[in-house]
Each structure stands twice: as C-alpha cells, then as structure tokens.
Curated annotation (Swiss-Prot):
Gene name of the record: ung
Cell compartment(s), UniProt: Cytoplasm
Species name: Xanthomonas euvesicatoria pv. vesicatoria (strain 85-10) (Xanthomonas campestris pv. vesicatoria)
Transmembrane segments: none
Protein name: Uracil-DNA glycosylase
Pfam hit, one: UDG
Length: 241
C-alpha cells in the first residue's frame, strides 16, 4: 500500500475477508498518491508499519465493539493506527479527554495518565478510522483518496459476517458511515462527537460504555475493561514505536 509495502502485512483473519479490496484499482491509485506525497516531502502519518495497526490488534473473530473515527491525528508522533489513541508520552488529545470524562462519570473509572488505547483493542474493541493516513499539520489531507471505500468494505463485512457487535458512532461522519449496519443484528449506539465543540450536546452523559458492557453480558460475553493501566505498566511491544 505504501513505500515499504513489503513490510506491511494485513493480519491473516482480515486479509482472508477484505484483503482482495487492497488489490482494486482505486487502492493502487491511493498507493501511488502516497508515494507521490512522500516524494514531495510530505510527512505522512502514521508510519507505514502502523497503518493497519487496528487490524493487527483486533483480529476479525475477536471483534466485540467497533468505534469509528474519521482520520488520524496530524501532529508529530501522535497517530499509531488506532482511532482516538496516541502513544504513551504524547499529550492526551481533547476528544480523548472527553471520552475519559464520560467513562469516569459512567463507570467511576479514574482518568489514566496517558492516551494509549491498545488495551481496549486487545480486548476486542476495533478502533477504526475511516481514512488511515494523514499529512503533518493537514487534517483530512487524505480524504477522498481511496481509504473510505476500503473501510466501508470493512464495516460492511463485519455487518454481514458477524452478529451482536456494538457499534459506537460518535458524530455525523461516523453515523453516516454506519448507515449500512443492520440494527436487527447489531447494537448501534449514537451520540455527538466527543470533540470539545460538540461533547456537551449529548456525548457527555451518553453512558455508552456501560451500555456496551450490558449488551455483551446479555450475549454471554465478557465485558470490556475500560480502565487502562498506568503508563508505567503498559505493554508497548506491538506499537511499532
């Protein structure tokens, strides 16, 4: 998909279901676009080996919950392939601070000292951005270049081949992308985006985290532990950092 493509391998369970999409002409055009931007000196985030990190962290059969984001953070060292997440040591972005505030109000879990959400992903929370790359300082720079078709296909495949998932759709963009989800097969929870611009309009107070766990328990599944270990106890071996 990118310069260094040989080092990027889609996780096997995902490759079996959505890997063919990466061979389509529009994805080859996206690959060419990424190479051109890098050749022009653009800083593309996240680093190549982390572009598909959400799939590596949460294999297809292990998905319980899907959180849809828009595109990666565009600051130096922020994006590492999981939506809303940043690597340990990077300041927690404002939207994630509001997510933590809601978790604390909903479940009584104290805010962690970092923004690294890999422990959620390893429990079955697919942290998926609609667009998987961005350029430094240019939010949305890679929108409408081909990623959306691929991630639409991912959502549609989960919708058709899995049952009983929880989709957390925050903001109009995620809700539009989630229109294909069959609400007779899956639990869909909607709220405004956790951005400081909109969180007060209904994200804060949505109680999506307890509602997610209630649904999982009803299906006989283990709930998500939304608490995060302190930064000093994190396992960062799979970040590529």
């Amino acid at each position: 998909m990118t310069e260094g493509e040989g080092r990027i391998q889609l996780e096997p369970s995902w490759k079996a279901r959505v890997g063919d999409w990466l061979l389509r002409p529009q994805m080859q055009e996206l690959s060419a676009f990424l190479r051109q931007r890098k050749a022009a000196g653009a800083r593309v985030f996240p680093p190549g080996p982390q572009i598909f990190a959400a799939f590596d962290a949460t294999p297809f059969e292990q998905v319980k919950v899907v959180i849809l984001g828009q595109d990666p953070y565009h600051g130096e060292g922020q994006a590492h392939g999981l939506c809303f997440s940043v690597l340990p040591g990077v300041p927690v972005p404002p939207s994630l601070l509001n997510i933590y505030k809601e978790i604390q109000d909903d479940l009584g879990i104290a805010r962690p000292d970092h923004g690294y959400l890999m422990p959620w992903a390893r429990q079955g929370v697919l942290l998926l951005n609609a667009v998987l790359t961005v350029e430094q300082g240019r939010a949305g720079a890679h929108q409408n270049k081909g990623w959306e078709g691929f991630t639409d296909h991912v959502v549609d495949t989960l919708n058709r081949e899995r049952e009983g998932l929880v989709f957390l759709l925050w903001g109009s963009y995620a809700q539009s992308k989630g229109k294909v989800i069959d609400q007779a097969r899956h639990r869909v929870l909607k709220a405004p985006h956790p951005s400081p611009l909109s969180a007060h309009r209904g994200f804060l107070g949505c109680r999506h985290f307890s509602k997610t766990n209630d649904h999982l328990r009803r299906r006989g599944l283990s709930p998500i532990d939304w608490s995060l270990p302190p930064r000093s106890a994190l396992d960062t071996t799979s970040t590529g950092a």
